[in-house]
């Protein structure tokens, strides 16, 4: 049987698998915070992912340390993806349902694009900024409506999670261009693992393992195995096979998929406001990414 070059169809397949894996993060975190603290979830994700990363690097034969000049980018990628995003997300989901988080985090493509613009000096057209403003306004309206007329602390945590994720994607994209997505992710997790091990052990001392619900364990393991590692591996492979411009659009479906999982798995109510705002954000993010100028 001859080897076949990956096609754009492979890119779509892996991209969809990655997106679906990411979309379960909100539900998994919402369930896990019932028995685990945000610190335990965040540090535990890193420890689990680091074990998988070490195995992956050995299998791929990528055990040689990256060049020193790439370390700042790898560490920045890890800090945003493995610490900032999950920690702030867990803090938020202690207070609001996963549906709320799904709508707000729908702004992730805009956050990523804006950070990339600031980092690269791009000059996007007016349509880019208008689309971002519309998406932000829709999320702001939803958050104020859900908060009874005002923003909540959870909304602040969610916006910090967005900034962390956007920063991680931008920095990760820079180092992934040289190392490859899976290799970059693996080294980022390994570099952070020693710093995550102690907080993880310490945070678990307050957990009564015998009373932890199976659903909390499932959410905790999902966050480490799927959200932190496998989904990223599928996603980066999809980008490599199908191209960033084409496959990257698949992630726009993530908040809509997260809404669906929230209703199906948690039984959360999806209000008309949530659906309308999610659709507006989705449309705005499509325009945002389509109008962005690449340099």
Language-model segments: which ranges?
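Membrane-interface helix termini and inter-helical loops of multi-pass transporters
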Residues: 27-35, 91-94, 140-153, 201-220, ...
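Helix-helix packing/entry segments at the starts of transmembrane helices
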Residues: 42-44, 82, 86, 100-107, ...
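Hydrophobic transmembrane alpha-helices of multi-pass small-molecule transport proteins
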Residues: 53, 75, 115, 124-144, ...
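Hydrophobic/aromatic residues within transmembrane alpha-helices
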Residues: 32, 41, 45, 92, ...
């Amino acid at each position: 049987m001859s080897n076949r070059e990956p096609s754009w169809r492979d890119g779509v397949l892996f991209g969809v698998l990655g997106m679906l894996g990411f979309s379960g993060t909100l539900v998994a975190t919402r369930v896990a915070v019932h028995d685990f603290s945000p610190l335990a979830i965040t540090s535990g994700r890193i420890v689990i992912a680091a074990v998988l990363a070490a195995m992956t690097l050995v299998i791929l034969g990528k055990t040689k340390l990256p060049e020193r000049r790439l370390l700042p980018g790898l560490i920045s990628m890890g800090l945003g993806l493995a610490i900032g995003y999950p920690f702030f997300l867990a803090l938020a989901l202690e207070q609001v349902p996963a549906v709320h988080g799904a709508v707000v985090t729908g702004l992730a493509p805009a956050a990523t694009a804006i950070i990339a613009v600031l980092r690269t000096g791009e000059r996007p057209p007016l349509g880019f900024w208008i689309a971002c403003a519309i998406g932000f306004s829709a999320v702001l309206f939803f958050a104020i409506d859900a908060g009874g007329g005002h923003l909540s602390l959870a909304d602040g945590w969610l916006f910090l999670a967005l900034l962390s994720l956007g920063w991680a994607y931008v920095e990760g994209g820079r180092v992934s261009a040289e190392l490859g997505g899976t290799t970059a992710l693996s080294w980022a997790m390994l570099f952070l693992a020693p710093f995550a091990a102690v907080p993880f052990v310490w945070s678990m001392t307050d957990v009564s393992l015998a009373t932890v619900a199976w659903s909390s364990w499932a959410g905790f393991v999902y966050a480490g195995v799927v959200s932190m590692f496998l989904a990223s591996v599928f996603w980066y492979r999809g980008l490599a096979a199908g191209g960033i411009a084409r496959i990257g659009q698949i992630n726009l479906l993530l908040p809509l998929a997260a809404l669906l999982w929230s209703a199906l798995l948690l039984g959360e109510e999806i209000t008309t406001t949530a659906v309308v705002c999610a659709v507006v954000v989705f449309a705005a993010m499509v325009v945002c990414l389509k109008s962005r100028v690449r340099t």
